Amino acid sequence: MLDIARVAQDVEAREFAGMGSLKLVAPAKVNLYLNVKGVRDDGYHEVSTTMHALMLHDVLRMKIIPGTGEAVKLTTRSFEGLAPLDVDPQDNIVVKAILKLAEAFGRTLGEEETMRVHLEKRIPVQAGLGGGSSDAAAALLGSAVLWGESVLDSRIKEVAAQLGADVVFFLQGGCALYDGIGENLVRTLKPMNDFLVLVKPEGGVSTAESYKKLDEDPQPISAKDAEAAESAEYAMSVPLLNNMAKASEQLNPGIRTVREWLQEQPGVCNAMMSGSGAAVFAVCDSFASAAKVATDAQAKGWWARTTTFGPFKATLTTNC
């Protein structure tokens, strides 16, 4: 089985070898601070959140091929114990991102040219780690480069905002505070480089259901705590706060089980759910502690990975 997987990876690598192909990385993130406030007139929730990028990342390989009739041809492969993506490729946010940017740039895909994309998934879905949004941000950058456009073109950020607030963050990366519906950059913070463990129980959480449950039972963050989080200039100074945690833990009790277990482990400084879940992150005092916690979590049957905070963002790495 491993030999078959290696052969498949070799075939994929060869397809994207040579000039005209791009390789991009799409990092994960965690929310150090997430304060969901009231519902606006347009139906969206007002939020204030501090996001921090991580070294853990997906990889996108992209190139333009002669038109096949398809606007975008997307294939995916999951790594590190993740299940294959259970979504039609045409419904993937990567495809949506490319189509929206093509429209913004006035390009027609399908007949004369097709965007070929291969996505290597290492960030779990329904985890609150921003994997899909990061993939979309990377796809926007890759498409712009392949079409000969500047990655600083304002239309990229405009399309990112249409796709979702987290997509905007991954174009910026590092650590930053956002408000509005999560798309308005308030300030950047100095990133940290601490080690952390990501642990995800079985199942996920519907973000919509989590918001609904939070609306039924609001969990306001005190003005004092909100001020401490929103005035911080350094990532390490941000208090870990997430008022969606209770709602998501009720929807998926496994999140609470993971969080409470992490909080009891030696070397763990603090642990909290990221975003609307279902992943929980634990900041650790050393790599050795983080590695031990990850190993023990995997022994319990949970998906777990050690990684680091850092100044990462969706980025073109090399022509491959």
Regions found by a protein language model. Give the residues of each.
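Glycine/serine-rich anion-binding loops at beta->alpha junctions
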Residues: 116-147, 165, 270-284
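Short, basic/glycine-rich phosphate-binding loops at helix/coil junctions
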Residues: 69-85, 139, 161, 232-241, ...
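ATP-binding N-lobe of GHMP and related small-molecule kinases
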Residues: 2-127, 145, 149-153, 183, ...
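Solvent-exposed alpha-helices and their adjacent loops that cap or buttress functional pockets
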Residues: 16, 53, 161-162, 168-171, ...
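Conserved, helical-rich catalytic subdomain that frames metal- and/or nucleotide-binding sites
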Residues: 170-270, 285-291, 295, 306-320
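Contiguous, small/hydrophobic- and glycine-enriched helical/loop subdomains that border
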Residues: 113, 136, 140-177
